[in-house]
Regions:
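Bacterial Sec-dependent N-terminal signal peptides
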Residues: 1-27
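Aromatic, loop-rich ligand-recognition surfaces of beta-strand-rich domains
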Residues: 700-768, 772-811
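C-terminal beta-rich recognition modules with glycine/proline-rich loops and embedded aromatic residues
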Residues: 237, 299, 365-373, 378-468, ...
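Short, surface-exposed beta-strand/strand-loop-strand elements in extracellular ectodomains
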Residues: 165, 492-500, 505-510, 742-759
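Aromatic (Trp/Tyr) and acidic
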Residues: 24-113, 117, 148-180, 215-232, ...
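Short, hydrophobic/aromatic-enriched beta-strand segments in well-ordered soluble domains
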Residues: 483, 533-544, 723
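Asp-box/WD-like beta-propeller blade repeats and closely related beta-sheet repeat scaffolds
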Residues: 142-161, 187, 192-212
Length: 811
């Protein structure tokens, strides 16, 4: 194998691809995944998590579907009950689909009669909701006008209706259920719907000419094609890929859905992070089956932009809450990082497909980083609480929830966790790839052999891995063992992050004798005549390492992250003597001791050492610190947390003195987004960020918490302080938000007024100075003193723009 990027086709396989358009090489054989049902885990890290997913996460998610009307919507659509459609989104149907997929994966590994029958009952309701021609989106069938902003007045009217997104998750659930049980009950529903989709969408006369809107149907149709062999499913998936960014039907092109230009012309990852991961996974599926090298060239360019400029050290993607997506290159802010759980899962999907297409370990490196950090941080150790977003810093405002109004992440976790063994192995001809290290037994079928592979390891806490290879018949083949980038001075396969020291050498032995295995594309390749009893031992030294970000990542200046093996660590408040983390710095080279604590957070490695703490008066003192795996934070309640730790006193933040503003409760009156909603739907909500005492650098500084009015353009919006007691005040200072966003810009307001609370009413203050709306500075307002328990800003937003406040001081 040549040591360069290669494309491996699903039917014939490797073709070299790189940005400089080097000639393609003839493939040897395809790289094929090993079904997760053939890999049986028996470790102390993943096995308990997967069992918790089976016994807690899946049942609790189904209960939430029952409680929140997800099943009722299908029953209403199917005429099984009467009632009003429930839920706030046109894609709520996907919640049951995703959980069915996860439950099916669990059934395939460990049969549960009760769960099997429960799935039958749920599928019965879903099938009843399907219209005679195969159509299935309950809010449309139920004619829920409350959600007409999503779907319009008739089928397929709006590109962002999520009808095809619903269909895609239906197909994935149906394929999983069929493979697990052999039952066609849900598969037949999916086929009927897919036949309709193939009839309605396409390049032909009378068909709708547009892409999916929210991608997933692309890779879902490919799954349906692989199960049924029906070519039209592959062709429709290909059509959706090719139609992206063309706007044939006249719809507005948008970065949000990666629909701003044809995929072959794309070179930067933009827009909604989950949509991006799903789209590019689908593109990889289609390109592999249709032998389209041009799409893999595009995917490589886009991936290099993601991994080189937009990937968080936790493997998360998507920096902004606005649009749940990507910001500019190198915008990797920690406190406001979005890193949606679904996006980390999508990142795994995409990287796994890129590995299958190329045989390059760099994709498995990113996959592993996301898997051990960004994905599993999305679910509590108890299995019944979830993060939607996964920031790399918190002041205690983040906490996992049992469910969400937009509940995409819990269902996604249930289906992903059940399939983790799927990412461990792959085959190419008679060769075997080892991508992940988990204690397990696997029965692997190659082109002409059956091989039992048994791993014995304490990974990810211990870097010693023993792999017993037992082929059914003695045979020469290559065992390709991934040597992780973290073991070779490369946290990621780009210059986005680097270690501050050099890695200790790893070692490999076969049957007790050390070998110098050559690496090809990141894999130590062991070619020999394998026979029963052969054992490979790999030792990956797991030293505590410090990680530095590329200088262009502004929010990481003067900070270092802590990594051991594939695990990122963080400081959490309750593990520190003063319960705070931001007033500490840890100089590079500080010794840290790693020890396993079986009784803490279900058993984790803890790092202990001595940090420096900056006091309010500027003094610096030594204090002990403890660091825990990032994925396990917030399992003991809301708390401060940080992944990137200052290495000098200048970058640490002494805990500030409390102020009138910092002690206040911050509120806004949230008007409903839906245009025809009644005024009574307005709610008073907590507004976080404007009184946290983090000093902004500029009006476009979104690295720390701030308040913004989402989807509000040209309106009057309010923000209020509710004080803990009456105060006499005479001055406020407001730092306005102003930055660009593809989904709507944020600008300083056109004007504003300040009100104080007198009894139950609000009165305008008597201003002594001018109301200003300057950028990049505090806008100070003096007024006649008032004694009050509250202040309120009323901001007139500019026409066509939203706005917000970064910080608001009261004197």
């Amino acid at each position: 194998m040549k040591n360069k990027l290669q494309i491996v086709w699903s039917s014939i396989a490797i073709i070299s691809v790189c940005a400089c358009s080097t000639p393609y090489t003839q493939p040897d054989a395809p790289i094929k995944e090993v079904p997760f049902t053939q890999v049986h885990l028996d470790d102390n890290f993943w096995t308990p998590r997967i069992e918790t997913n089976r016994t807690v996460s899946i049942p609790s998610a189904f209960k939430e579907c029952e409680k929140n009307g997800r099943f009722d919507n299908f029953a209403i659509a199917g005429g099984l009950m009467k009632g009003e459609h429930r839920g706030d989104f046109s894609f709520d149907d996907t919640d049951p689909y995703k959980i069915i997929e996860g439950a099916s994966y669990s059934l395939a590994v460990k049969y549960d009669e009760k769960q099997d029958h429960y799935l039958d009952s749920v599928i019965h309701i879903i099938a009843a909701a399907q219209e005679p021609d195969g159509y299935l989106t309950t809010c449309v069938t139920n004619q829920c006008t409350r959600l007409s902003g999503w779907w319009g007045t008739h089928r397929w009217e709006k590109i962002n209706s999520h009808e095809l997104y619903n269909s895609g998750h239906l197909y994935e659930a149906a394929v999983a259920h069929y493979r697990a049980t052999g039952k066609r009950t849900l598969l037949d529903v999916a086929i009927k719907n897919a036949d309709l989709v193939c009839q309605v969408f396409g390049p032909g006369e009378g068909q709708i000419h547009r892409p999916c809107g929210h991608p997933i149907a692309e890779m879902a149709l490919v799954k349906l094609y692989k199960v049924t062999g029906d070519e039209k499913y592959l062709q429709t998936a290909k059509y959706f890929v090719e139609e992206t960014g063309r706007g044939t039907d006249g719809h507005k092109l948008s970065e949000y859905s990666q629909d701003h230009k044809p995929i072959l012309q794309q070179d930067e990852i933009v827009g909604h992070a989950v949509r991006a991961g799903y789209l590019y996974s689908g593109v990889a599926d289609v390109a592999a089956l249709t032998h389209d090298t041009a799409y893999f060239n595009a995917l490589t360019r886009i991936w290099e932009n993601m991994a080189g400029k937009k990937l968080f050290i936790t493997g998360g993607i998507g920096s902004r809450p606005q649009g749940e997506g990507f910001g500019p290159n190198y915008e990797l802010n920690n406190h406001t990082a979005y890193c949606e759980t679904c996006a980390s899962i999508a990142n795994v999907y995409w990287n796994h497909r890129m590995f299958l297409a190329t045989g390059d370990a760099k994709y498995a490196d990113v996959l592993e980083r996301a898997l051990y950090n960004g994905v599993i941080s999305g679910v509590s150790l108890s299995g019944d609480k979830f993060f939607y977003d996964n920031p790399l810093e918190s002041m205690g405002q983040h906490e996992r929830q049992h469910w969400f109004g937009c509940a995409c992440c819990p269902g996604n976790i249930t289906r992903f966790m059940a399939s983790v063994p799927y990412y461990m192995y792959a085959t190419q001809g008679n060769d075997v790839y080892v991508n992940l290290f988990i204690q397990s037994k696997a029965d692997i079928e190659t082109e002409s052999n059956k091989i039992n592979v048994e791993q014995t390891t304490g990974y990810p806490w211990d870097g010693k891995i023993s792999i017993a290879v037992t082929p059914e018949k003695e045979q020469e083949f290559a065992l390709r063992v991934r040597i992780p980038g973290w073991a070779q001075d490369a946290p990621v396969p780009t210059d986005l992050y680097s270690f501050t020291d050099k890695a200790q050498a790893y070692s490999i032995s076969v049957n007790g004798s050390k070998v110098n295995a050559k690496q090809y594309d990141g894999y130590a390749t062991l070619v020999r005549n394998w026979k029963a009893g052969d054992v490979v031992e790999i030792n990956l030294p797991m030293e505590v390492r410090r990680v530095k970000a590329n200088d262009q990542v502004e929010d990481d200046h003067g900070k270092l992250a802590i990594e051991r093996g594939p695990i990122m660590f963080c400081l959490e408040g309750q593990d520190q003597a003063d319960s705070t983390v931001f007033n500490k710095f840890i100089p590079d080279g500080t010794p840290m001791e790693a020890s396993f604590h079986a009784d803490l957070l279900n058993g984790i490695i803890v790092l202990n050492g001595t940090a420096k703490e900056v006091e309010r008066n500027g003094n610096v003192k030594d204090v002990p610190f403890k660091a825990i795996p990032y994925s396990t934070w917030n399992n003991r309640g809301a708390d401060q947390m940080a992944v990137w730790i200052p290495e000098t006193a200048e970058c640490a933040r002494p805990t500030p003195e409390p102020t009138i503003a910092s002690k206040a409760r911050t509120l806004m009156i949230q008007a409903p987004i839906q245009k025809d909603a009644p005024e009574s739907a307005s709610v008073e909500t907590w507004a976080w960020g404007v009184n946290d005492q983090w000093e902004p650098k500029r009006s476009s500084d979104i690295s720390k918490p701030y308040h913004y009015w989402w989807l509000k353009n040209g309106t009057v919006e309010t923000l209020a302080y509710e004080f803990d007691q009456p105060y006499t005040v005479s001055n406020v200072q407001v730092y306005w938000l102003d930055f660009d966003h593809y989904d709507g810009d944020f600008r300083v307001p056109e004007s504003w007024k300040l009100y104080y609370k007198e009894g139950e009413s609000w009165k305008e203050v008597e201003a002594l100075t001018e109301y200003t709306v300057k950028k990049d500075c505090y806008n100070s307002l003096d007024f006649n003193p008032v004694k009050t328990k509250g202040l309120k800003i009323a901001a007139q937003l500019q026409k066509g723009a939203s706005g917000g406040v970064i910080e608001w001081k009261v004197n």
